Amino acid sequence: MSALSLLILGLLTAVPPASCQQGLGNLQPWMQGLIAVAVFLVLVAIAFAVNHFWCQEEPEPAHMILTVGNKADGVLVGTDGRYSSMAASFRSSEHENAYENVPEEEGKVRSTPM
């Protein structure tokens, strides 16, 4: 069996390479650029798809939303009778339906001329 293997190996090393193993030459520079851009766009699309499915924000659980009265009460527009935890930080202590404007530090506020 080993003699047969050595004979086949010897024949394969003696045979010249096939013509299809020789390259035809480099691609044109514009074709290389086009292929590089296409590969880059495919990789970016894959990254966006992975980011979309991997980093999805889970919906807020229902037990964290507290109902405080009916819609006729003075709650934030769009909350439909649900208490918003964001509103607690700027509610006014003077009136239950009033909100205070919280002053921002000068460095955090960005303004652009109109």
UniProtKB/Swiss-Prot annotation:
This protein's GO cellular component annotations are: apical plasma membrane; extracellular exosome
* Chain segments carrying region Disordered: 94-114
Please give the start and end residues of each transmembrane region: 29-51
Q: Where in the cell is it found?
A: Apical cell membrane
Query: What Pfam families does this protein map onto?
Result: MAP17 (PF15807)
Function per UniProt:
Auxiliary protein of electrogenic Na(+)-coupled sugar symporter SLC5A2/SGLT2 and SLC5A1/SGLT1. Essential for the transporter activity of SLC5A2/SGLT2 but not SLC5A1/SGLT1.
Protein name stated in the entry? PDZK1-interacting protein 1
UniProt lists the gene as PDZK1IP1
